[in-house]
């Protein structure tokens, strides 16, 4: 946990996160409160962590995610043995429907805390309609730090036009990850279409590596940025998408 390993003399800021999967309490305020508490046992009595962190909507327990991986939370193609993955029966993954009052109320409890403490919201592996609903409700509550989690990923599959609308209407950044190219068979042509539609101010470039077969963060980003430069993306735009935009989301004042 970042709150437990962070040191006063750190020269590089460490930023934590929590994903609201079932094993963290699901989509409600429980996981957010745990993150705010610094992961202390009694989250109601703990002091609130002063540092901003990322709150992801569900990822590997989403019904949309499970449909992509034969009902397993983790794909064996990622280098994980099947016995270390979890199988979810049809329909048991997380789903969000605006007609489900209980689930929407639980979502709102999580969003209220994210807004109250000015945290960063990432949309996780929700499907297209679920993603749009979360962004819509988050923005209405005043949340301004919003990331569309690798929105070309097969569980979500937003179009570049939709990403453009999410940026202009809600200020939601579209994330393009190096790892999705190999793992999920996405292409640089698809990434270029997103950059063209949204513009560098509304895009985040990240590695999302850490798998046993992936390059290091440094090597992956070096390759990633080099491929964009070969395709005509200016260095200033790469800096915008990989440094300035994340810095704004994490550390700068936003209104």
Q: PLM features: residue spans?
A:
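Active-site beta-loop-alpha junctions enriched in small/polar residues
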Residues: 17-23, 58-62, 126, 151-154, ...
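Extended substrate/RNA-proximal surfaces in nucleic-acid metabolism proteins
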Residues: 10-12, 25-148
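Divalent metal-coordination and catalytic microenvironments
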Residues: 14, 55, 59, 121, ...
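Catalytic pocket-lining loop regions of alpha/beta-barrel enzymes
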Residues: 112, 117-187, 204
């Amino acid at each position: 946990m970042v709150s437990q390993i962070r040191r006063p003399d750190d020269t590089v800021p460490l930023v934590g996160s929590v994903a609201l999967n079932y094993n963290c309490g699901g989509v409600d305020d429980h996981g957010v409160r745990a993150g705010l508490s610094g992961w202390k046992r009694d989250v109601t009595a703990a002091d609130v962590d002063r540092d901003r962190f990322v709150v992801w909507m569900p990822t590997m327990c989403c019904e949309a995610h499970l449909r992509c991986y034969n009902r397993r939370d983790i794909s064996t193609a990622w280098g994980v043995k099947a016995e270390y993955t979890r199988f979810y029966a049809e329909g048991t993954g997380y789903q969000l429907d605006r007609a489900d009052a209980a689930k929407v109320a639980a979502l709102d409890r999580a969003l209220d805390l994210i807004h109250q403490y000015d945290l960063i919201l990432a949309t996780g592996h929700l499907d297209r309609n679920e993603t749009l609903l979360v962004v819509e409700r988050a923005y209405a509550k005043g949340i301004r730090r919003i990331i569309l989690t690798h929105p070309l990923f097969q569980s979500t599959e937003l179009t570049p036009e939709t990403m453009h609308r999410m940026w202009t209407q809600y200020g939601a950044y579209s994330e393009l990850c190096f790892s999705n190219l190999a793992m999920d068979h996405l292409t640089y042509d698809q990434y270029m279409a997103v950059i063209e539609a949204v513009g560098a101010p509304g895009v985040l470039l990240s590695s999302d590596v850490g798998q046993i077969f992936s390059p290091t963060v440094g090597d992956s980003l070096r390759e990633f940025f080099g491929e964009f430069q070969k395709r005509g993306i200016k260095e200033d735009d790469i800096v915008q998408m990989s440094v300035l935009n994340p810095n704004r989301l994490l550390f700068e004042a936003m209104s």
